[in-house]
Design a protein with these regions (language model features):
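Acidic/polar loop patches that form or flank catalytic/metal-binding clefts of enzymes
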Residues: 3, 34-38, 59, 77, ...
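Glycine-centered hinge/linker elements that transmit conformational signals in sensory
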Residues: 7-39
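Soluble non-cytosolic domains of exported or imported proteins
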Residues: 12-19, 45, 102-106, 158-166, ...
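Extracytoplasmic/secreted envelope proteins and their assembly/folding machinery
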Residues: 19-22, 26, 48, 52, ...
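Conserved C-terminal helix/tail region of periplasmic/extracytoplasmic solute-binding proteins
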Residues: 30, 147-197
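Short helix-initiation/N-cap motifs at beta->coil->alpha
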Residues: 37-52
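Short, Asp-centered acidic motifs that coordinate Mg2+ and/or phosphate
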Residues: 53, 57-58
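C-terminal lobe and pocket-closing loops
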Residues: 59, 63-75, 84-170
Length: 197
């Protein structure tokens, strides 16, 4: 995790997990040579197109790419997270919240169930938002995500979190360009967080 449990401190150096994850990415390029130079310059659609053409074996993509891959005839699958001692991945999330003062909680719960049903989500994601519907009664490929959701984390809600996340992203980019070591990328992010905190 980027922050400690109560969101008051950047926890990237509290154990070796962040450096190990950064080292894994770094080694893919600099030790094993499986990430070509141009890989860092590719944007989302270019990555997806290269994947469709068979030039990329594994890629991290946004959720809407699933529909594009299927439409292109690609037999694809996904894993929610790589795994070492533990596993985790960041996910985007929205929430439908029932007010505790609601006078008709049963009606509110029924509305939430209706809105999140596969039928409504399919319509929502074809007519309003171009992301594939991912609900518990949707594509079998997403079943594991709903059965074992403890490894899914939303972005941290903490003071200055956006600035820290942006700095981490930039430091990891510098690392992948060879300007920082994995240890420096993580430590520089922690130092920045402490300077604004």
């Amino acid at each position: 995790d980027i922050y400690n449990e109560d969101g008051t401190k950047v926890a990237l150096m509290d154990n070796d997990a962040a450096v190990k994850a950064a080292r894994f990415l770094y080694d893919l390029k600099f030790k094993y040579g499986v990430l070509p130079e141009e890989s860092m310059a590719l944007v989302g659609t270019e990555v997806r197109n290269q994947f469709i053409e068979g030039n990329i074996a594994i890629a991290s993509m946004d959720a809407k790419s699933g529909t594009v891959l299927t439409d292109a005839g690609v037999n694809w699958d996904f894993i929610p997270s790589l795994e070492d001692e533990t596993r985790a991945t960041w996910i985007a999330s929205d929430a439908l919240i029932m007010n505790s003062a609601s006078q008709n909680k049963e009606l509110a719960a029924s509305l939430i169930k209706y809105i999140t049903s596969a039928e409504v989500m399919a319509k929502f994601h074809t007519e309003i938002a171009p992301f594939p519907p991912i609900t518990r009664d949707e594509d079998e490929r997403f079943k594991e995500m709903y059965e074992d959701a403890e490894h899914l984390h939303t972005l941290p809600v903490a003071n200055g979190a956006f600035k820290v996340m942006d700095t981490l992203y930039k430091n990891l980019q510098l690392m992948m360009l060879g300007d920082l070591s994995p240890e420096e990328a993580i430590q520089n992010t922690v130092d920045y967080a402490e300077s604004i905190g």
